[in-house]
């Protein structure tokens, strides 16, 4: 899948430090852009919000099978993979972004070994196009399932209707579902307007989700590095599918 797409692309290594026990090293393209097909090369602010939520709620992810939608450079998935998950699958669509994501997965595993802190989680990268038949089956085996879907800045963006990622998250959570345990889609995003928030609530309800909005004040630390951009209009949402 990944071929030689790295050969003519320049990257710079960026270290994101949350505390003494949790950091993520990332390769980021020097030509990072906001063009729609390459937005995954950018470190989006909601990723930082999600990471702080995850660090405050480690028990939510422990021993869980997790899949990330729109993983981009991989900050969220690579941080969550350090929190005791059973399996982490990071996904994105465009070839260039999937290649960069794979590059960062390899860098993360090399870092784990060098630090003498090898993680137990099975960490992988898959290509996933939302709403395309057969895509989920390419990411999950015939006996696999997913407990939690995660994402950052994938609901309210220039790509339009949030129904697409919400429907994709539901389809993943329902894939091979045989238990009676609640399933969750946890997402951080920038709320563009009250109208946008209401529409997302309506779509979630229509798809069978219950929605909980978690106040950032309940999990953000007192001091945040200036490089970790977190804006007041960002939300952390838990969309839950009950048995």
For each feature predicted by the language model, list its residue ranges.
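S-adenosylmethionine-dependent methyltransferases
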Residues: 1-243
């Amino acid at each position: 899948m990944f071929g030689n797409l790295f050969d003519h692309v320049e990257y710079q290594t960026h270290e994101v430090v949350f505390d003494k026990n949790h950091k993520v090293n990332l390769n980021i393209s020097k030509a990072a852009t906001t063009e729609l097909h390459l937005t995954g090369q950018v470190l989006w602010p909601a990723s930082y919000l999600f990471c702080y939520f995850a660090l405050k709620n480690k028990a939510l992810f422990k021993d869980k099978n997790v899949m990330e939608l729109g993983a981009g450079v991989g900050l969220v998935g690579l941080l969550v993979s350090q929190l005791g998950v059973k399996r982490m699958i990071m996904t994105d669509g465009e070839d260039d972004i999937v290649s960069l994501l794979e590059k960062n997965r390899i860098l993360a595993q090399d870092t784990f070994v060098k630090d003498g802190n090898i993680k137990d989680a099975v960490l992988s990268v898959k290509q996933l196009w939302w709403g395309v038949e057969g895509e989920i089956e390419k990411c999950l085996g015939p006996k696999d399932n997913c407990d939690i879907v995660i994402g950052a800045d994938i609901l309210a963006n220039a790509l339009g209707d949030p129904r697409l990622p919400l429907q994709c998250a539901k389809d993943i959570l329902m894939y091979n579902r045989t238990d009676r345990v609640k399933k969750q889609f946890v997402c951080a995003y920038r709320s563009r307007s009250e109208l946008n928030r209401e529409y997302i609530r309506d779509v979630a309800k229509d798809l069978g989700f219950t929605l909980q909005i978690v106040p950032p004040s309940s999990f953000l630390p007192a001091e945040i590095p200036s490089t970790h951009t977190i804006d007041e209009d960002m939300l952390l949402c838990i969309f839950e599918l009950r048995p």
